[in-house]
């Protein structure tokens, strides 16, 4: 399960690191990111595929599509493959220079009718307007909690009536027993994909101050507060999942 022919294998944490520090999406992470996320996030490839299918349903002519926290552009490419209407544009945004550089290369390698603009910047500063679809694919969890509602409010305001937000996240759980079980099953998943206990432990230590997760109930509450009348989990595997939020017509 751990072999990846399309990208270098993630062995960044295979040996002890004296001063771990906090997680950063730097050049080293960007280089191995496809292998890392495939082996670390259960259901990731399914979510990416389904985001493309959702684009085929929700993207309307002469509208804009946003991939906020686009990393290497997997969701952007999936949407572009499935958009079959005229006059659309996809805008991908990420604050990591290493991710943006590689993302642009990936976008340039696959020509398609729908134009794509990749922006290096803070998603909190991006103007969202005339949007038929917005994707936050494992991005919100890296924002300061105080900024999360503000971003969702701006997304809601920038969406056209009937537009959709896809919000994928790692979840925490109010039920501690369920939370512990799914946490442990996720670690089983990573072990089955070839990660050692050292790799799992070091990565977790680097992420614990940077990636702050919320329960599904909190996500739904924020989405409803932003104005979305419809919000529900459409995909979940262990403690990873994705919600759909649809703006009223």
UniProtKB/Swiss-Prot annotation:
NCBIfam families: carboxy-S-adenosyl-L-methionine synthase CmoA (TIGR00740), PRK15451.1 (NF011995). InterPro entries: CmoA, Methyltransf_25, SAM-dependent_MTases_sf. One of its GO terms (biological process) is tRNA wobble uridine modification. Homodimer. Coiled coil: none annotated. Keywords: S-adenosyl-L-methionine, Transferase. It comes from Proteus mirabilis (strain HI4320). S-adenosyl-L-methionine binds at residues 44, 69-71, 94-95, 122-123, 137, 204. The gene is cmoA. Belongs to the class I-like SAM-binding methyltransferase superfamily. Cx-SAM synthase family. HAMAP family: Cx_SAM_synthase. Catalyzes the conversion of S-adenosyl-L-methionine (SAM) to carboxy-S-adenosyl-L-methionine (Cx-SAM). Its EC number is 2.1.3.-. The keyword S-adenosyl-L-methionine applies. It catalyses: prephenate + S-adenosyl-L-methionine = carboxy-S-adenosyl-L-methionine + 3-phenylpyruvate + H2O. This is Carboxy-S-adenosyl-L-methionine synthase. One of its GO terms (molecular function) is S-adenosyl-L-methionine binding. SUPFAM superfamilies: S-adenosyl-L-methionine-dependent methyltransferases.
């Amino acid at each position: 399960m751990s072999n990846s022919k399309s990208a270098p294998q993630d062995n960044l944490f295979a040996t002890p690191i004296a001063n771990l520090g906090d997680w950063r999406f730097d050049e080293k992470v960007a280089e191995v990111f496809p292998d890392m996320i495939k082996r670390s996030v259960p259901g990731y490839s399914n979510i990416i595929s389904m985001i493309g299918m959702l684009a085929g349903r929700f993207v309307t002519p002469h509208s804009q599509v946003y991939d906020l926290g686009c990393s290497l552009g997997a969701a952007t490419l999936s949407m572009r493959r499935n958009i079959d209407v005229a006059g659309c544009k996809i805008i991908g945004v990420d604050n990591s220079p290493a991710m943006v550089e590689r993302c642009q290369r990936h976008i340039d390698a696959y020509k398609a009718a729908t134009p794509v603009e990749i922006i290096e910047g803070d998603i909190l500063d991006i103007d969202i307007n005339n949007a038929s679809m917005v994707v936050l694919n494992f991005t919100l969890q890296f924002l300061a909690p105080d900024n999360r509602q503000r971003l969702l409010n701006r997304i809601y305001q920038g969406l056209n009536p009937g537009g959709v937000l896809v919000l994928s996240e790692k979840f925490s759980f109010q039920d501690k027993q369920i939370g512990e079980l799914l946490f442990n099953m996720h670690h089983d998943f990573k072990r089955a994909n070839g990660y050692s206990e050292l790799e799992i432990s070091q990565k977790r230590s680097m992420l614990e101050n940077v990636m702050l997760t919320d329960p599904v109930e909190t996500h739904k509450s924020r989405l409803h507060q932003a104005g979305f009348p419809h919000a529900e989990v459409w995909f979940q595997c262990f403690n990873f999942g994705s919600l759909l939020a649809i703006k009223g017509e």
